[in-house]
């Protein structure tokens, strides 16, 4: 009943992916320790001879379905907004109707009977006028006015798009780290199995006074560090009884010409700056002296209710104009030229900072390329060394140092661990470059070549 109760309590619980093993052993037997070594050597020989070769995890930098949906919806809304605003401008033909009605109270109280004066006086006046405000219409600078609408919406669209794509870099870095962590974690798990057996052996030797505390403490510390790393890297993944995964070493070649061209012309930041400059140039065209005047041809019809209770009518045509006695437009254009210089200087500063940070990352990638190649060569040579030593150990009639042999296998695993971490750091450096220069989809700037 107790066993059934215990099973019922544990049923349905998710098993832990990793549990620390025993650190301190008691009552160790020499035969048991040697048997553990031999079993582990046989297991390692099989794993090393038959690894699972995998390609280096790919940096899947790109927009997911939700990104595409959000961007497409935003683009569609801005295009619709621009179209409606252009239609509104096209309706602005400059025609305007004005009218006025007013009375003259003095006409009711004046007793003068002069007929001539009676004709010139009126009690009320009604006036209607059709004018054509041509300068403030689509017919004057219509192209520039439509461009102003389009550029303002394009600037807003690009700025929103930049915010919509800002999260893909962290997401991509997390996904890449997760992939590498699995491979790194499995290597550390195999190293930990070696350290467990070495720890067991050192404690047996300590009991027999054959070793100092220093070596045992080092192995115990290495074991604790490995357990900590696994708990961080693979806390929610099962890495027990996994094969040895061999990631094919690669070298990353960066097309710096295409990279800097993207920074200068194709990135979202560059397009935003170019749009701001186009807005300033277009605004400079709109700012001229004529645009501050009003020139309105008109036709007017007037009806008078005269003091003698008769009605008279008359029509006239003319041109009404308003001309300012000052001209502020040269100063406005000068201000716009200054604004363009501010935009260019700001962009120049941004590009300078981007180039500095990117050059540091490019140097880091090159250094990591060299370190990865060195580790790959070291792994290759260590593997050959282990193969040669395997036959030597088998033919050793007087026995051999089991701990030394285990350290050789552990050294190979540690070299794999270092190389995988170097490749991860290189991938993260690439993502940081892509973030700095606003690359948000897969491109041909970074090419990965197998060594």
PLM-predicted stretches and their roles:
Residues 6-22, 26-68, 236, 251-260, ...:
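Acidic, low-complexity, intrinsically disordered peripheral segments
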Residues 342-381, 388, 392:
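C-terminal structural cap/anchor segments
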Residues 100-108, 131-133, 198, 300-304, ...:
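Outer-membrane beta-barrel pore domains and translocons
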Residues 24-27, 47-98, 213, 238-299, ...:
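Amphipathic alpha-helical coiled-coil scaffold segments and their short linker/junction regions
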Residues 37, 145, 149-231, 370-441:
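Charged, solvent-exposed structural "stalk/scaffold" segments
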Residues 46, 68-148, 161-165, 169, ...:
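A glycine-/polar-enriched beta->alpha junction
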């Amino acid at each position: 009943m107790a066993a059934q109760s215990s099973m019922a309590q544990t049923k349905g619980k998710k098993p832990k992916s990793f549990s620390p093993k025993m650190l301190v052993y008691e009552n160790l037997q020499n035969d048991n320790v040697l048997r553990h070594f031999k079993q582990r050597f046989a297991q390692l020989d099989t794993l090393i001879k038959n690894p699972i070769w995998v390609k280096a995890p790919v940096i899947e930098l790109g927009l997911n379905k939700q990104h595409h949906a959000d961007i497409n919806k935003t683009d569609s809304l801005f295009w619709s907004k621009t179209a409606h605003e252009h239609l509104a401008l096209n309706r602005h033909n400059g025609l305007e109707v004005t009218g006025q009605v007013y009375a003259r109270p003095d006409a009711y109280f004046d007793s003068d009977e002069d007929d001539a004066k009676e004709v010139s006086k009126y009690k009320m006046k009604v006036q209607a006028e059709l004018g054509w405000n041509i300068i403030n219409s689509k017919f004057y600078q219509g192209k520039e006015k439509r461009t102003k609408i389009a550029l303002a919406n394009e600037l807003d669209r690009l700025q929103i798009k930049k915010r919509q794509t800002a999260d893909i870099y962290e997401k991509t870095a997390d996904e890449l780290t997760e992939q590498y962590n699995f491979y790194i974690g499995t290597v550390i798990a195999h190293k930990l199995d070696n350290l467990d057996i070495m720890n067991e052996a050192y404690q047996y030797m300590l009991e027999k006074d054959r070793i100092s505390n220093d070596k045992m403490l080092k192995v115990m510390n290495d074991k604790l560090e490995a357990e900590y790393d696994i708990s961080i890297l693979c806390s929610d993944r099962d890495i027990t009884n996994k094969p040895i995964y061999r990631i094919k070493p690669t070298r990353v070649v960066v097309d710096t010409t295409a990279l800097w061209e993207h920074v200068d012309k194709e990135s979202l930041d560059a397009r935003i700056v170019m749009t701001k400059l186009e807005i300033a140039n277009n605004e400079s065209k709109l700012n001229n002296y004529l645009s501050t005047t009003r020139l309105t041809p008109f036709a007017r019809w007037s009806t008078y209710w005269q003091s003698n209770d008769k009605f008279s009518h008359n029509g006239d045509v003319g041109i009404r104009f308003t001309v300012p006695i000052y001209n502020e437009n040269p100063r406005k254009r000068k201000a716009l030229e200054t604004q363009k210089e501010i935009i260019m200087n700001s962009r120049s500063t941004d590009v300078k900072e981007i180039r500095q940070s990117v050059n540091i990352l490019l140097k880091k990638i090159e250094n990591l390329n060299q370190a990865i190649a060195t580790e790959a060569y070291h792994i290759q040579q260590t593997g050959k060394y282990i193969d040669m030593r395997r036959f030597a150990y088998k033919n050793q009639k007087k026995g051999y140092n089991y701990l030394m042999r285990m350290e050789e296998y552990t050294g190979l695993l540690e070299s794999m661990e270092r190389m995988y971490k170097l490749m991860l750091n290189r991938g993260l450096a690439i993502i940081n470059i892509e973030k700095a220069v606003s690359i948000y989809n897969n491109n041909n700037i970074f090419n990965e070549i197998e060594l």
